[in-house]
Design a protein with these regions (language model features):
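Hydrophobic alpha-helical transmembrane segments of multi-pass inner membrane proteins, especially
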Residues: 51-67, 73-271, 309-367, 394, ...
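Glycine/serine-rich anion-binding loops at beta->alpha junctions
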Residues: 147-157, 201-203, 283, 287-288, ...
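Active-site-proximal helix-loop elements at catalytic-domain edges
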Residues: 2-34, 275, 325, 332-357
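A juxtamembrane structural motif centered on a specific transmembrane helix
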Residues: 1-29, 365-450
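Cytosolic juxtamembrane amphipathic/interface segments immediately preceding
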Residues: 29-45
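TM-adjacent membrane-interface loops and short helices in multi-pass inner/ER membrane proteins
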Residues: 260-304, 315-319
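Transmembrane helix boundary and interhelical junction motifs in multipass membrane proteins
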Residues: 204-209, 287-292, 302-304, 321, ...
């Protein structure tokens, strides 16, 4: 090694890294997508989506019920927060049901299937008893409990069909009987048609459509062939066409599809058209919470069936897209739980609950947008109505319990250690010492020290 002019050894410079340009450089968007996929594939993703999505939908629904129901309550000479307080009470009770259902073992879920089905059938039959059943908006599907409280037994019929149908199909799959048509159809389809008949006696076709969707979802999960689907669908379509043709009210709802004027000939399309008006006047970010104009007596059922229209008017396109995204996340999580489990009951029950909530949301939102006839079904977890909220929150608790039963999710939860209290494997745990990052005070030194 030769020395420099000053006699010092030359300093070796570090080799410069070649500048990477073009496609060799990592794309930040690609990194973000990879990280998002990793987060999406985590074992507890479905658990958090169900828990967080349902909580956000319920809370936002409470806010919109309070906003959309004030004028209706005042018109009925009631306090402005009347409907909100009833919905808040139902949400509190539903939260308890959700917590209980999420902590139940799967065996207990299966044990509850037959009692819930029997109770739903008895209550739905009592609706038709004079003096017991109550008619609301032309549909006799209610039972007066006491005071101003009423229950709609047909809402519990959805939960009954999901649990009982899932238990029935799981038992037959364990015995390898689902390859035969008669075991796939009987007694599932006759029991479902019995529930549909009890519902249609009260004139509630919207709930009947949801129940039919749940039935088709269970048959699809059971592996029903296409010919079987076509046969059952043909029977359901024929019965539906007869019921629509024989009802002037249902024919009028069909005539309101695509209507742009409140009065289309002899048909009154006031509700459908004013729902479109509410959505159109909201713009991107809405007129502001509580500033809806259509809820001032212009839009019927503003806090129940058409609460999505009030949401679009007050929160705009951003608010409605947020609601759609939450329901999409909830539906994806339910499909993921049903697809990853090895327990046939969990697969059928999770698929049935997901079909129930997703189909009801699509029918409600489609009716508000003018894409589907008005079916008179509430938006799940969002619209006013305790009878619809309680079984729906119990069903969400089922999904949470099923998401926790996933082997990977169970392992991820077991690896977590509690930060406070006792350890999982017994014994006591010392209190955690927090790192405060404080600097020590300088120690005073004598004048003789350096």
């Amino acid at each position: 090694m030769t020395g420099s002019r000053t006699g010092r050894p030359p300093v070796q410079r570090a080799a410069r890294r070649p500048v990477v340009s073009g496609p060799a450089r990592e794309n930040p968007l690609r990194i973000l997508i990879v990280r998002a996929r990793r987060a999406w594939d985590r074992p507890l993703t479905a658990y958090y989506l169900i828990l967080g999505g349902s909580a956000l939908i319920t809370v936002l629904g409470l806010v919109m019920v309070y906003s959309a129901s004030q004028i209706t309550a005042l018109q009925m000479s009631l306090p402005g927060s009347y409907f909100f307080r009833k919905q808040l009470l139902a949400a509190a009770i539903g939260g308890v049901l959700l917590l209980v259902a999420s902590r139940m073992p799967v065996k207990l879920h299966r044990a509850l299937a037959y009692p819930i089905l029997a109770g739903a059938v008895v209550l739905m039959a009592l609706v038709q008893v004079p003096g017991v059943g109550v008619s609301v908006n032309g549909n006799q599907n209610w039972i007066a409990v006491g005071g101003s409280f009423q229950i709609q037994p047909s809402e519990f019929g959805k939960l009954a069909l999901v649990l009982w149908g899932a238990d029935l199909l799981a038992r037959k799959q364990d015995r390898r009987l689902l390859s035969q048509w008669k075991h796939m159809l009987v007694p599932l389809v006759p029991a479902a048609f019995m529930l549909l008949g009890l519902i249609m006696l009260g004139g509630d076709m919207g709930t009947a459509i949801i129940l039919t969707a749940v039935l088709f979802g269970l048959l699809w999960l059971a592996g029903a062939p296409t010919r079987l689907f076509v046969g059952v669908l043909s029977i359901a379509a024929l019965l539906g066409a007869i019921l629509i043709r024989t009802s002037p009210n249902r024919m009028a709802r069909l005539a309101c599809l695509g209507a742009t004027e409140p009065r289309t000939g002899p048909v009154d399309c006031w509700q459908a058209v004013h729902g479109i008006y509410a959505l159109a006047s909201g713009g991107i970010f809405g007129s502001g919470l509580g500033a809806s104009v259509e809820k001032w007596g212009q839009l019927p059922e503003a806090h129940t069936d058409f609460i999505f229209a009030v949401t679009g008017e007050e929160l705009g396109l951003a608010g409605t897209l947020s609601v759609l995204a939450l329901f999409a996340a909830l539906g994806y999580a339910g499909i993921r739980v049903a697809g990853r489990t090895e327990d046939p009951f969990v697969r059928y029950a999770a698929g049935g609950v997901t079909t129930w909530i997703t189909a009801q949301a699509v029918i409600n939102i489609g009716a508000v947008l003018g894409l589907l006839p008005i079916a008179g079904v509430p938006l799940p977890l969002f619209s006013y109505g305790g009878s619809a909220l309680l079984p729906t929150m119990f069903a969400i608790g089922l999904l949470i319990a099923f998401a926790r039963e996933d082997p990977a999710a169970r392992m991820a939860l077991a690896m977590r250690q509690p930060r406070f209290g006792k350890k999982r494997n017994g014994g006591s745990q010392r209190p955690r010492r927090w790192n405060t990052m404080r600097r020590r005070a300088p120690v005073a030194r004598s004048s003789g020290e350096r």
